[in-house]
């Protein structure tokens, strides 16, 4: 099959491209930057430079690329692209282009930090962090320190730890921010996959030992923790996930708290593949093609590091 993959400069792209090509798929990669700016541009079977996701012609451009290259499906790799494609599902469906991503109902929750808290706060199986719209903050008492986040934020954008009252008062669009009690602790992230038809699910967890300022783990320790696996499974089943997502937790006072749900491949999806041998990308596609998923694979705890290689772009 010919598949269009967006944002091939993102951290998950090389794993996605490799997994698709290993199983015979033809990959058309797109990005806002020229092919020469990313090694992944050369890994793709074909590459097309496209406008920013917020360009009025973005979706029309994707549809035109699918027409020219005979792509039958799209795999978006970043949240903003998922948001704009989700808002324009009808035009992709009209052209019979499959979207290998979560449903609108799931995205409505997963891309909203307040709704995540509201959706799971009554469940004993998941520990959530109390979350309030900044515009409603005066009606609640939250013990300091606080953490300020964008309501629909990604990659730690807009995060302010323990903001002052004056800082809060300078924010004009308060409905676009949430505030939470700040929890100190270690970050754990879970790559999770679920087949909606059969109910089969599987996950690989890792502790992020070194994490960039935008929330990407570059040195991690893979672990198996039944508590994390059970929480991820509960979240996936309650949301009725189909395909692969990433779930972030923070361990505070010996408890795991749900931080975020990323409705896409994590930037560290290659860590899970290298550790377990389980191909989340291939099996994600199978969830949308009525194919049987790979069975569960046991994996060992190990420390993995992200490495980089300098190459010429010419």
Language model segments and positions:
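Anionic group-transfer/hydrolysis microenvironments
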Residues: 33, 78, 151, 182-183, ...
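ATP-dependent carboxylate activation and anion-phosphoryl transfer catalytic cores
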Residues: 69, 224-314
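ATP-binding N-terminal substructure of ATP-dependent carboxylate-amine bond-forming enzymes
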Residues: 1-100
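Glycine-rich phosphate/pyrophosphate-binding beta-alpha loops
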Residues: 156, 209-215, 219, 262-276
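Phosphate-binding site of ATP-dependent enzymes
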Residues: 159-240, 250-251, 255-257
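Short, charged, surface-exposed secondary-structure boundary motifs
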Residues: 37-40, 58-60, 102, 107-113, ...
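Short catalytic-loop micro-motif centered on adjacent basic/acidic residues
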Residues: 4-5, 73-76, 130, 178-181, ...
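Active-site nucleotide/adenylate-binding loops and adjacent lid/helix of ATP-dependent enzymes
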Residues: 107-186, 196-199, 226-229
